[in-house]
Amino acid sequence: MILALNIGNSNITFGGYTPDGKLVFSSRLFADTALSSDELLYKIVNMLALYGAEPQQITAVIFSSVVPALTPRLREALRKMCECQIMEVGPGLKSGVRIRMDNPAQLGGELLCAIVGALQRCTPPCVVVNFDTATTLLAVDSTGALVGGSILPGPQCSLSALVRNTAQLPQVELEARPRRLLGANTADCLHSGIVYLSLIHI
């Protein structure tokens, strides 16, 4: 099994894949920057067990991170967990994607992965969208090169700002699709507004 991980600003996401690329399971954990390497190891092993997998089944690991405080701890946890190849997606990795930006090293590993995945699925030119704490739009030209992008507040970031700066708007769960475009109560109105406004931005 190949284990793929991404440490984002809000979550650590996981995917377990067969060698031919079939997704077996996916999961996510809250990205707590206070976690030690042993705590990360404990959470990863328990997450694997939840899906009936064991560390010895893992033949390779690939990960990316935009949280520098957690990156070395995750690397250490993975080395303790399995004696397999561990690949970190970051500056210097030869992905085959030409990055025509002022500073290619600033491109997040998760965004590079998204571009590689998009080029496997469609013929450029295309726009690659990544929804996370920030929503990122990346423009890929007809040659498959990254030529620019835009960053805007992500759905959760927008929701948090509204809840924090208003007296009566509630925190709502954004994972599910809104039940209707026009909400009939405050929570549904907020849910619909955040999700559909994010789509309109694109």
Name every feature range the model reports, one short phrase each.
Residues 1-24, 118, 125-142, 146, ...:
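Gly/Thr-rich phosphate-binding beta-strand-loop-beta motif of the actin/hexokinase/Hsp70
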Residues 1-89, 93:
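N-terminal glycine/serine-rich phosphate-binding loop of ATP-dependent small-molecule kinases
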Residues 32-36, 107-109, 114-123, 147-194:
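Glycine-rich phosphate-binding loop plus the immediately following alpha-helix
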Residues 81-117:
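Glycine/small-residue-rich loop that forms an oxyanion/phosphate-binding "nest" at active or ligand-binding sites
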